[in-house]
Amino acid sequence: MRRASRDYGKYLRSSEEMGSGPGVPHEGPLHPAPSAPAPAPPPAASRSMFLALLGLGLGQVVCSIALFLYFRAQMDPNRISEDSTHCFYRILRLHENADLQDSTLESEDTLPDSCRRMKQAFQGAVQKELQHIVGPQRFSGAPAMMEGSWLDVAQRGKPEAQPFAHLTINAASIPSGSHKVTLSSWYHDRGWAKISNMTLSNGKLRVNQDGFYYLYANICFRHHETSGSVPTDYLQLMVYVVKTSIKIPSSHNLMKGGSTKNWSGNSEFHFYSINVGGFFKLRAGEEISIQVSNPSLLDPDQDATYFGAFKVQDID
């Protein structure tokens, strides 16, 4: 009995020594060290994500409206008025011409009340869709990015358009007479005329970006005997490409061309064409205009009298 007691005591001491060894793991509750908070995404990634979600929201809203109009037209084509179609067209034109400052273009003030309400409803639908996609907490900071035009955020995600312009003469506003005048009425969106990232204001083409530009002008003069006799026997038919600076009021002739013609003969028809072009360094805010002599003899066709510019490269 005593021997058994001693053996049991040795067993207990041996168990205690083995349990206190460094190799035995702790059996109590484990408390892992708190992990460091995840770093916040960089602003650029957050902005890119928001722009992507914005594009998704815009696409979903536009598709929904298109499907609504389609099925509505299928059910009753007479229910969709031409006013609704014109409103969509005018709203799109308003934002397409946002970079132009000519008073003849579409502007917020020229929209009728019905179109303005449609624009506001569309804007509200886009904002609601974005809030549904990104959540109310993340959307709370979005209005700061959506200040100004309701399509500004979408435009910011696009690369800036290369500046160019091709302008054709407005035949209804050609001055009369034989004296030298500045042509102040050009088309920018009719026929072959087009403009992008440049401004047409009071007949002058304004540069919005510094750079090297290629400028060109083609002016045609013509006269038919049915139009009566020419003012004089000898005509000086000239064209001038003029640069004007707004910051420092001054004007300089960049190019000119022309000739003196005798149109007093027995010919039934007279025609003369002038074409000039060249590279020039232009600064933002400078304006290009066209001056001609004998404006009453101008050929009003879009393939005869026009001028334009396009950016070739940046200024180093």
From Swiss-Prot:
PTM description: N-glycosylated. The soluble form of isoform 1 derives from the membrane form by proteolytic processing. The cleavage may be catalyzed by ADAM17. A further shorter soluble form was observed.
Disulfide bonds listed in the record: none
Pfam families tied to this protein: TNF
Keyword list, A-Z: Cell membrane, Cytokine, Cytoplasm, Developmental protein, Differentiation, Glycoprotein, Membrane, Receptor, Secreted, Signal-anchor, Transmembrane, Transmembrane helix
Gene3D superfamilies: 2.60.120.40
Segments in the Extracellular topological domain: 70-316
Cellular component, GO, one term: extracellular space
Keyword Membrane assigned: yes
Name by which UniProt lists this protein: Tumor necrosis factor ligand superfamily member 11
Taxonomic source organism: Mus musculus (Mouse)
